[in-house]
Amino acid sequence: MKKLLPQASLLRLLVLPLLLLAMPSGRGALLSPLASPPDWSTLHRFSGVITASEFERLLRQVYVPDGSWRQWISLTPGQAIITPHDGATPVILPLASTESATKIPSRFWKERGQRSPQPGKPLAGLRIAIDPGHLGGKFARMEARWFQIGHSRPVEEGEMTLIVAKILKKKLEAMGAEVWLTRSRNGATTSLRPDKLKKAAALSLQEEGAPLSRTRLEFEAERLFYRVGEIRNRARLVNSVIRPDLVVCLHFNAEEWGNPARPTLTDKNHLHLLLSGGMSGNELLHEDERYTMLVKLLGGTHREELGASEAVARSLATATGLSPFTYHSANAIPASSNPYLWIRNLLANRLFECPVVYCEPYVMNSKPVFNRVQLADYEGRRNVGGLSLPSIYREYADAVAQGLADYYGGAAN
């Protein structure tokens, strides 16, 4: 009779080949999951677009506040010396001597001052991509953005953001903008699936130092599918196909709800928006993250992100009456004196090469939001808990549209 291997030994035999295949060969680049090695020569298109003092200010205050950028970037008054990875030839990037000598970056997007609004069309000439957050549909449970109480209408973020996106698209087009959606239905835009990502999942767990198990491997493969592969594909659509002036990322926030079949509802309900930046030293170890950070910095996205996000935050706060969410962790820093604006290193707002307005209003599992979701979308106003309110989806879309009109429509002034 054959002796059966213990389950742990069998798992090691199954996982070891995946790790061996995933192991990088030799020295060189350390990449984040599913990333391709960047072409550092493309940074030369940013020659002379920024001064050394402004470069350092953005690194210190926005993109890498912990100072770990100094391991990879050296600044002199006339040039930036950028190290792609250990042992690589540095990229020498000429810098402008004065602010008045800076050049306009070579990029596909236009900032607000490069276009002129028309009477009644405050967004004329503006190209906008709307990114409805998450996947929804059959993947909603996998991505843990779904819950249901009894036989009530399920609360599903991917479906909710898509409803808002379709309403917002019509409003922005009526204001003169050209508008695209990164997805027009529930589901994935990427052809990747978890069963094709086991090797990448094994490498990701190895880098984290996480213990290997069949369950962890399957969970990580799923995470790489819906959170990494999907976002990378949307970034490809934005940067290579749509090439907009702005991306509007639509999300709903949430507090911990426990068992999605028996979720906990909360009284908390709040609002915030996220800007790109706030990278840590560990994140900066990834060559692709350093590269995409520099593309955002040198492309001049921060000023535009800050201005547009300020306007949208103001409009959302007025429309919803929500208080600002406050982070109490090192992975987020305030973007300005505006309590609604925060800086975080998220994959989406880092990979999109143009400015991004990343919205996180409402708490999906708050009692008020749950009650409004049960009413679905509707025109006009209804009595909700003694208040006359529009549908939560139209309130969201109206406020974002108004904020963008306030910011871009005032460009001529």
Where are these regions (language model features)?
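A periodicity- and composition-biased signal for non-globular, repetitive helical segments
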Residues: A8-S9, L18, S240, W257
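Bacterial N-terminal signal peptides that target proteins for export
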Residues: K3-L14
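Catalytic-site microenvironment of enzymes
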Residues: G26-N413
